[in-house]
A protein has these predicted regions:
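N-terminal Sec signal peptide and the immediately downstream disordered periplasmic leader
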Residues: 1-77, 82-86, 203, 207, ...
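Short loop/turn motifs that connect adjacent beta-strands in outer-membrane beta-barrel proteins
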Residues: 39-41, 179-182, 195, 211-212, ...
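N-terminal periplasmic accessory domains that precede
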Residues: 80-83, 87, 107-110, 140-142, ...
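Extracytoplasmic beta-strand/coil segments of soluble accessory domains associated
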Residues: 81-127
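Short acidic/polar hinge/loop motifs at secondary-structure boundaries
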Residues: 127-156
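Surface-exposed, low-complexity loop segments enriched in small/polar and acidic residues
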Residues: 227-240, 264-295, 301, 310-522, ...
Length: 876
């Protein structure tokens, strides 16, 4: 079936669903609607995200969506990730408050499901520092104060020619308040329908405009409480599938210990006395795991300008963010790395007799235990992020504008993991007959205390950017004036990760990990042109060409160029066609280049040896080169003159990424780099050069398995946006429909085998619904407004059941619709009350075979259920 047929089918299905359920979508409008409103007020030249050329028309060859502050407030969001992750163009694995296992308290945006490191985040058009824990490689959205946001522009197109690395899936440009006069105070609180996950926020903004400039100061404090998996029916226990259906399962590493004897004994020590192990002895690890994670956050920000002369202005921006976040998981499961010999006292040994008669004297046993005596595993992060921008901008007599700026960012983090146990030391104590593992009291109090430790890791990153830019009109052509922009940037990035000392020495439970430390710098220069080709011809009212090229020279891999071409064709006043072709790239990050090494033993099969394990060292790879992308977009913008306030945009995108940075199967490296006789082959390839493969006289193969440029990802689809503003019943109305249709999403492994994710939900990689749509409707009176919103997510098949759905109890999930309502009322000219309810119908997330966490997918679905929020604002 053709792509167009699939698209038409998906559109029909989505619109029928919306009509049947009165669905609504997010408050996202295309650039055309915003442009019409702006033109009604005044005509000015502005730089739209995706171009550095200032222009009067917001519609360019690339699709840009705009989210304004009112839409953010209406959603009840206290962090911008709450809004961005609900966009239909967002997808994949999006880290948020509902991700307990491995989130590190971070919040990311993931356009097109291509990964947060392929979405560039800007603040006021300038690169934001990568932030979070470790040697972070993407932006933690917690660092951007939502109360300071004026609007967010989302470019859904590649833009490396304009902005450089990372702009493959698109660009999120957060525009902060700059011209603000007066004082504003906001207080907001919210809570779930279950009485948990409470969240409170207080912020103030004050600003003043004076003769030569202005200054704006903002502070925001947010505190979010937790919710437990034990407090929701769908997540109160880990669900397993049996012949008779679903049942509550659990871990065989149980409370009181689990013993497997060499002669078939299977014992549980739950309750303090050993007995035959049954399913009732399995440990419910959901009961002590967070469903939604707690956090505290402080954001301070400032922006100011000062006129140095009639044509030169000094500007500055400063942001500081401090985050305290926590996650909680079940007590640690531990096990013996080598079997223990049972030596009971009754047979002249030194161990308890409690295992008799199930285990014989001298019998080898394996042991596992859930360490409930020590408490849950508590993950905590403290993250400090600073961003400072200073610069000057001006205008020449000919109207050309220029600016010079310095952008400094710094991120530091400390993350801890409490209530861990050093099983290596416990094993040593058992062998020395100093610790009886079968005696329950050995695992309690002072006896176990010497083996309990807290892991403490540190990490951080630093960013320095010096930039110069120039833009203006260069020549009048028959069809209009040619505009240009040019600039130079120098950027240096560094990052580090210092693991806990026990981990670094290989004395902890996890494999030894070396520290990460490194840096790189890059010199970049770019030129951009906006060339009017044709004007004032029937059916060719205006045709414009845009072109951009960027040269970059990295200290790590060398130099190259990236480019972009775009065309806009205004057929007549109502209709504009647009398209673009570009290349984009993502340079390897510090952690990918210089990530600390860690040894492991991997299973391999190779004709040069009888050994089945290879000594493999994983980590970064300093020989990495950039990921490369080819991007095509085609679209139309239609604003019919016979329907005032109506605007439609339809855009097609196709993104092909090659040279993707990914891990490689160890068998693949061994077979690519050694022949059947153990001789090195393919030594000229990047893969084998980086592997440093060797085989010794015993047949032991050893090599480095660092990250490689060996993968490929392709995705394509359609974005449809319909916006309508009108008057009726004495009210002002605004309606919006935002739809994304996924046509393809494929990833290719090192052998060129394609893995198709379209229409599938995975166990942590992401969810790739074929059809997603958001709708919203706002009615506004003189002193009030009310908004209805809804999100539709198409049904998906479980990726775990792809080969044989009949083997799965829940091989798919049904489509789901979330309904939200909000309203505000102006009590006086200075006081406003607002509030709302998200997930009004209290929809539960779906269960599916092969789920990620909480028996569902917290990256995609709302796990809290119905949520209430209220807000009071004072402004004067």
């Amino acid at each position: 079936m053709s792509s167009l047929s699939l698209t038409a089918k998906a559109i029909r299905r989505g619109f029928l669903t919306i009509a049947a359920t009165t669905v609504a979508t997010g408050s996202v409008f295309s650039g055309s609607v915003i442009a019409e409103e702006a033109q009604a007020e005044k005509v000015e030249r502005i730089a739209v995200t995706g171009s550095r050329i200032k222009r009067t028309d917001m519609e360019t060859a690339s699709p840009v969506s705009v989210i304004d502050a009112s839409a953010i407030i209406a959603s009840g969001a206290t962090s911008i990730d709450d809004v961005l992750q609900k966009m239909t163009s967002s997808g994949g694995a999006m880290t948020n408050a509902a991700v307990n296992n491995g989130s590190g308290g971070n919040a990311r945006v993931n356009l097109r499901g291509l990964g947060s490191n392929r979405t560039l985040v800007l603040v006021n058009g300038r690169r934001m520092i990568a932030s979070g824990t470790g040697a972070a490689s993407s932006v933690d959205l917690n660092t951007i104060p939502v109360s300071m946001i004026q609007r967010v522009e989302v470019l859904k197109d590649g833009a490396s020619a304009v902005y450089g690395t990372d702009a493959i899936a698109g660009v999120v440009n957060v525009i902060l308040k700059r011209d603000f006069d007066g004082f504003e105070l906001n207080v907001q609180t919210g809570i779930s329908g279950q009485g948990d996950a409470d969240e409170s926020s207080i912020d103030f903004t004050m600003g003043n405009t004076f003769d030569k400039g202005n200054v704006v100061i903002n502070a925001q404090y947010t505190k979010r409480g937790d919710a437990s998996q034990a407090d929701r029916d769908f997540s109160e226990c880990p669900i397993a599938e049996g012949a008779d259906g679903l049942y509550c399962a659990g871990s065989s590493y149980s409370e009181g210990g689990h013993i497997w004897g060499a002669n078939g004994a299977d014992l549980s020590g739950r309750g303090g006395e050993y007995h035959e192990f049954t399913d009732a002895d399995r440990y419910n690890y959901s009961a002590s795991s967070f469903l939604s994670t707690p956090m505290e956050r402080l954001n301070l920000s400032m922006a100011g300008t000062y006129d140095l002369s009639d044509s030169i202005m000094f500007f500055s921006e400063a942001m500081y963010s401090k985050r305290w976040s926590d996650q909680q998981m079940a007590p640690q499961p531990i096990w013996n790395s080598e079997s223990w010999e049972y030596q009971p006292i009754s047979a002249g040994g030194w161990m308890t007799d409690d295992l008799l008669p199930w285990v014989e004297d001298g019998e080898l046993v394996d042991y596992g235990r859930r360490m409930v005596e020590s408490g849950s595993r508590d993950f905590s992060q403290v993250v400090d992020t600073i961003r400072l921008v200073v610069g000057v901008e001006g205008e020449f007599d000919n109207g050309w504008t220029w600016d010079a700026s310095y952008n400094k960012g710094k991120n530091d983090s400390v993350d801890t993991l409490a209530n861990l146990h050093n099983i290596g030391s416990i094993n040593d104590a058992v062998q020395a007959e100093e610790f009886d593992p079968f005696l329950q009291s050995s695992w309690m109090g002072d006896s176990i205390a010497p083996f309990v430790y807290t892991e403490v890791n540190a990490g951080g990153s630093e960013l320095d950017i010096a930039s110069l830019s120039l833009s203006g009109d260069i020549v009048d052509l028959p069809a209009g004036t040619m505009g240009f922009a040019a600039g130079y940037e120098f950027r240096k990035e560094s990052a580090y990760y210092t693991p806990d000392s026990l981990t670094a020495q290989g004395l902890a439970n996890d494999p030894r990990v070396e520290a990460t430390s490194g840096s790189f710098d890059v010199n970049e220069a770019y030129v951009e042109l906006a060339i009017p080709l044709i004007s004032d011809i029937p059916l060719l009212q205006q045709v414009d060409l845009s072109a951009a090229i960027r040269y970059f020279d990295y200290s790590t891999f060398g130099d190259d160029t990236t480019w972009k071409l775009g065309l806009t064709w205004r057929v007549f006043d109502d209709l504009m066609l647009r398209g673009g072709q570009s290349t984009a790239f993502r340079a390897p990050t510090v952690s990918e280049l210089f990530g600390g090494k860690s040894p492991s033993f991997d299973q391999i099969v190779h004709p040069a040896t009888d050994q089945t394990q290879a000594e493999v060292t994983v980590g970064g790879n300093p020989l990495l080169t950039p990921e490369e992308a080819d991007i095509t977009t085609l679209g139309l913008v239609y604003s019919p003159s016979f329907v005032d306030g109506l605007s439609l945009t339809v855009d097609y995108y196709d993104i092909g990424i090659t040279n993707t940075i990914t891990s490689v199967d160890s068998n693949y490296i061994a077979n690519q780099c050694l022949d059947a006789n153990g001789n090195k082959i393919n030594e000229g390839t990047a893969l084998c050069q980086a592997s440093n493969i060797e085989i010794d006289n015993t047949g032991r193969i050893s090599f480095d398995n660092g990250l490689q440029n060996i993968g490929e990802t392709n995705t394509s689809g359609f974005d449809i946006n319909l916006a309508y503003t009108f008057e009726g019943l004495g009210l002002d109305w605004k309606a919006g429909l935002d739809t994304s249709i996924l046509d393809t999403y494929e990833e290719f492994d090192q052998d060129g085998n394609a893995v198709d994710y379209k229409g599938f939900i995975t166990g942590g990689v992401g969810a790739y619904a074929e059809f997603k749509t958001n709708f919203n409707l706002t009615a506004a009176g003189d002193d009030w407004s009310a908004t209805y919103e809804a999100r539709y997510i198409d049904g998906m098949d479980s990726f775990a059941c792809k080969d044989d759905p009949s083997d799965c109890y829940a091989p798919s999930v049904d489509s789901i619709v979330y309904h939200d309502i909000s309203a505000n009322y102006d009590i006086t000219e200075t006081v406003r009350l607002s509030g709302g309810v998200n997930n009004v119908l209290d929809e539960e997330p779906p269960y599916y075979t092969g789920n990620n966490d909480s028996n569902t997918d917290p990256y995609t679905y709302d796990v809290l259920g119905r949520y209430f929020f209220v807000r009071a604002s004072v402004k004067f």
